[in-house]
Amino acid sequence: RFKKIRRLGALPGLTSKRPRSGSDPKNQLRSGKKSQYRIRLEEKQKLRFHYGLTERQLLKYVHIAGKAKGSTGQVLLQLLEMRLDNILFRLGMASTIPGARQLVTHRHILVNGRIMDIPSYRCKPRDIITTKDKQRSKALIQNYIASSPQEELPNHLTIDPIQYKGLVNQIIDSKWIGLKINELLVVEYYSRQT
């Protein structure tokens, strides 16, 4: 993880740690001019590691975004932001996206009253995300909510910290995406691969 954040910069979905500027001697040796391919590859890797996706999963999302109406890059980011594991992370119910994925796969999370154990589930507007009634599930979420930094919640989500309930209000607006990334470079990377 730390090699990744040193190379690619801050990845809040992967870890809360931040790279120290100028501390990596390898990057100082490689400080020559970056090729266009390397710039596109780094943007793609940033996106992949932030959301915790395999290469195959990301390629699938790029194909879905390419077929949809609108800007492929914006649609891609919307698809990734509306994943259940990412929504849990953005609500503050988990400290990282891998932590949120573990909560989902261990069956602690309900979507609209049903147990959901698929982290890639695409949340829709008016979805209600809650925890199981079991004490262990509530304790896990309570610890995450208490320890998470109180950042401003994106306007497409609302949370009730007393009942451990989150609500998806609408599809995310592009200005609320929590990662500094040029999504067009990711789309370019894949368009040149095929």
UniProtKB/Swiss-Prot annotation:
Keywords: Chloroplast, Plastid, Ribonucleoprotein, Ribosomal protein, RNA-binding, rRNA-binding. Belongs to the universal ribosomal protein uS4 family. One of its GO terms (biological process) is ribosomal small subunit biogenesis. Pfam families: Ribosomal_S4, S4. Residues 13-36 are annotated as: Disordered. NCBIfam families: PRK05327.1, rpsD_bact. This is Small ribosomal subunit protein uS4c. One of the primary rRNA binding proteins, it binds directly to 16S rRNA where it nucleates assembly of the body of the 30S subunit. With S5 and S12 plays an important role in translational accuracy. GO terms for cellular component: chloroplast; small ribosomal subunit. It comes from the Eukaryota. PANTHER family: 30S 40S RIBOSOMAL PROTEIN, SMALL RIBOSOMAL SUBUNIT PROTEIN US4M. The gene is rps4. Part of the 30S ribosomal subunit. Contacts protein S5. The interaction surface between S4 and S5 is involved in control of translational fidelity. It is found in: Plastid, Chloroplast. PROSITE patterns: RIBOSOMAL_S4, S4. One of its GO terms (molecular function) is rRNA binding. Residues 82-143 form the S4 RNA-binding domain. InterPro entries: Ribosomal_uS4, Ribosomal_uS4_bac-type, Ribosomal_uS4_CS, Ribosomal_uS4_N, S4_RNA-bd, S4_RNA-bd_sf.
